[in-house]
């Protein structure tokens, strides 16, 4: 056998191997699409997903696109939740793999991006729902969900700016921790101290990102003041003199700490009765009668104008 015959034989064998792989590794996209169109999502997934995973080199953008939509519907139908909800995470990956193919049709490209936006916002909505029904210890999961949302948004738009939403999230979490303090469930425990520290941390973090937010400043001041009042209300006939002095010192520190954010909120909106009342009350708690009376008079003048 001469050299050229050997080359032809090798080439023929390569073609046979390629044809065999094309036949046995065929991806049933059309059949999966028909199943999906008839609402048989699980069957469509069980047919398409293994074929795509086992033949990733053969899978084109369209195959990943179809798989992504099947996984998205399964996620919705299953009512999944949590950072690691499998169908949601798989759907995100499939759509991103579809978009990585330049051959993906323009309509499918646009639909993939819309689907990714929907999936990213589902992470965001879940994070906000967890803040609204906040329980102690949920913070890590909330931030993990937000990171998933931000990562997908940044994938869709490299110029995506998370600052405003992060500032809002810190403010919401600060208020959530403040609400936990109000329940008195953790009264006089180390956990209560941790909750107060977390509330302060999130108020400060929010103001770092949005220094001019009136609501953040006002609520920060109220949280500190109210916690001082709670300490005073716990004084009873069993409180020792030493404990009484400790409580008084802690309360004064909280009242003093609440003054700057309340003053800043008032400077921002000097016509708001709530900040005037807040300043009047804080100064009164600090035994600063002259300052308290001055804010009381400002309140009276403001009320007369209304």
Residue ranges with predicted function:
Residues 70-140, 178-201, 226-260:
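Short coil/linker segments at helix-helix boundaries
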Residues 236-260, 264-306:
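Terminal, low-structured helical/coil segments at or just beyond the last alpha-helical repeat
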Residues 26-89, 119:
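Start-of-domain marker
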Residues 1-37:
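Bacterial Sec-dependent N-terminal signal peptides
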Residues 52-62, 77, 97-116, 150-169, ...:
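Flexible helix-coil transition and linker loops at the boundaries of alpha-helical arrays
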Residues 42, 49, 89, 96, ...:
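Alpha-solenoid helical repeat scaffolds
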